[in-house]
C-alpha cells in the first residue's frame, strides 16, 4: 500500500466510521500506519483470495473494517464493554462483522462457538505483549479453528529495538531492575502494560514449543510505522540506524502457517 493509496484507503475508512457515528479517532490516527503495513506485508505474498478473518483484540474494529472492505468476512473478538458501544455495533452491522464478546482470553469460550477449520486468517496484532495468563487454552482454540491452509498474523514490539526495553543502562546502574517500572505497574490499568516483550528468536521458539504443526513462514523486523514523526537530527539518525541494522527495528511481524494438524498444541502447563 503506497503512500497515495494508503491516504485514499484511510479516507475511505474514515468515512465509514463517520457514517457509523464515530470511533476512537486518536487511536485510529495513531495506529492506521501499522494496520496498513501489516495488511500490505500479508498481501505481498498471499496466494489465495479473501476468506474468513478472526480479529482477536479487535478494539473498535479498525482492522476488521479495513479487511472487510477488501472482501474478508470478519469475526471480531473483544471485551463485552467494547461491543456495547453504539458506533461499534453500527459499523459491525454495516460490514457484516460478527461480534464475539470474551471477558477473559485465558478462557476463550467465544472461540469455542466457531467450527473447526473455519478460519483463513487470524489477526493477533499488538496483543501477545499484553497477555497476563498462561495462553495454552487460547492457542488450542486458535489451532482448532484455523484451516491447515490458514495464516496466523502476529505483530508485537521488538524487545531488542534500538528504542526498546532491553537497553536500560541507567536502571541497571542504579539497581532499579528491568522490565515494567513500578510506576507503570501501579499507575496503569492491567491491559495497558507490555507484560512481556519478545525478540524474534523468542517468538520463533514460542510457536515451535506450542506445536510441531505451526510453521513460521515470516519472521520480520519491521521499520518504524510513522517515520515522518522523526524530524529532528537525532530522530533522523535513529531512523538511519534502524534502517541499516534490522535487528534494532521497533516492530516484529510474524506469519505462522500450519504444516498439518496431526500434533495439536502439545505444551502443557504444570506446577
Residue ranges and their predicted role:
Residues 81-83:
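Helix N-cap at the beta1-alpha1 junction of Rossmann-like dinucleotide-binding domains, i.e.
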Residues 49-59:
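Conserved class I S-adenosyl-L-methionine
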Amino acid at each position: 500500500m503506497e503512500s497515495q493509496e494508503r491516504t485514499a484507503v484511510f479516507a475511505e475508512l474514515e468515512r465509514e466510521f463517520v457514517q457509523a457515528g464515530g470511533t476512537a479517532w486518536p487511536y485510529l490516527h495513531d495506529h492506521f500506519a501499522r494496520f496498513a503495513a501489516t495488511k500490505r506485508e500479508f498481501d505481498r505474498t498471499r496466494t489465495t483470495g479473501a476468506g474468513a478473518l478472526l480479529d482477536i483484540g479487535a478494539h473498535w474494529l479498525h482492522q476488521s473494517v479495513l479487511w472487510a472492505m477488501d472482501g474478508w468476512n470478519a469475526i471480531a473478538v473483544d471485551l463485552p464493554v467494547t461491543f456495547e458501544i453504539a458506533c461499534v455495533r453500527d459499523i459491525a452491522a454495516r460490514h457484516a462483522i460478527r461480534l464475539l464478546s470474551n471477558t477473559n482470553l485465558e478462557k476463550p469460550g467465544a472461540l469455542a462457538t466457531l467450527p473447526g477449520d473455519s478460519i483463513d486468517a487470524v489477526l493477533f496484532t499488538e496483543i501477545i505483549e499484553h497477555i497476563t495468563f498462561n495462553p495454552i487454552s487460547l492457542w488450542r482454540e486458535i489451532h482448532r479453528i484455523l484451516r491447515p491452509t490458514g495464516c496466523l498474523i502476529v505483530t508485537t514490539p521488538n524487545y531488542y529495538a534500538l528504542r526498546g526495553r532491553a537497553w536500560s543502562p541507567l536502571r541497571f546502574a542504579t539497581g532499579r531492575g528491568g522490565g515494567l517500572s513500578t510506576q507503570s505497574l501501579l499507575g496503569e490499568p492491567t491491559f495497558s502494560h507490555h507484560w512481556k516483550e519478545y525478540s524474534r528468536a523468542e517468538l520463533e521458539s514460542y510457536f515451535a514449543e506450542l506445536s510441531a504443526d505451526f510453521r513460521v513462514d515470516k519472521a520480520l523486523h519491521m521499520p518504524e510505522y510513522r517515520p515522518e514523526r522523526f524530524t529532528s537530527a537525532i530522530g533522523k539518525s535513529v531512523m538511519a540506524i534502524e534502517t541499516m541494522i534490522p535487528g534494532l527495528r521497533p516492530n516484529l511481524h510474524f506469519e505462522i502457517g500450519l504444516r498439518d494438524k496431526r500434533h495439536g498444541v502439545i505444551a502443557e502447563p504444570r506446577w
